[in-house]
Regions:
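Metabolite-binding pocket within alpha/beta catalytic cores that recognizes anionic/polar moieties
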Residues: 1-127
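Active-site rim beta-loop-alpha module in soluble metabolic enzymes
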Residues: 130-170
């Protein structure tokens, strides 16, 4: 059975809702990741704190490739990633959940691919639908059952941190 991966962003660091918790680390070709493994309702969950367990890794220093490679190595098929963000959409209020369906990546100094040349042929990733529609549908259904304010669809815009956007960028 596949594990479920959770990458927790700012404000999501407490995996205590899981049972049978144990902390581990894994060396990947891209560096080491720390993670917490546990179970939730009988499912194996692998939790990675995006900014590190002590919230000390700034956005531009996060080892995204190690996190993703490590989760795949650990048997994760689905990843739920949380983040605390602002919104330009007045319908998205604080505390609402937005299931993004598109993204704009305005970062400049982050590695964005596993491909670095060499013996492997060039690979181009199709990001027409960058987020899994089936997983988004499951999350939306569960969110509605739980009476959460949930929006299915939104564009995540990522700018280079660690800073907030300028008024012109917004």
């Amino acid at each position: 059975m596949s594990a479920i991966g959770v990458i927790g962003g700012t404000g999501v660091y407490d995996p205590s809702i899981f049972e049978n918790i144990h902390e581990e680390s894994l060396m990947t070709p891209y560096g080491e990741i720390d993670y917490v493994q546990g179970t939730y309702k009988g499912k194996t969950v692998i939790f990675v704190a995006r900014h590190g367990k002590d919230h000390t890794i700034p956005p531009h220093k996060i080892n995204y490739r190690a996190n993703i490679w490590g989760l795949k190595k650990l048997g994760v098929k689905f990843i739920i990633s949380t983040t605390a963000v602002g919104s330009l959409n007045k319908n998205f209020e604080p505390g609402h959940f937005v299931l993004t369906d598109q993204f704009l990546d305005f970062t400049k100094n982050r590695v964005t691919t596993f491909y670095e040349g060499g013996n492997r042929p060039v690979a181009h990733l199709d990001v027409t639908n960058p987020y899994c529609p089936e997983l988004r549908q499951i999350i939306e259904s569960v969110g509605k059952e739980q009476k959460l304010s949930i929006h299915n669809g939104g564009t995540y815009v990522c700018t280079e941190g660690p800073r907030f956007e300028t008024p012109a960028e917004i």
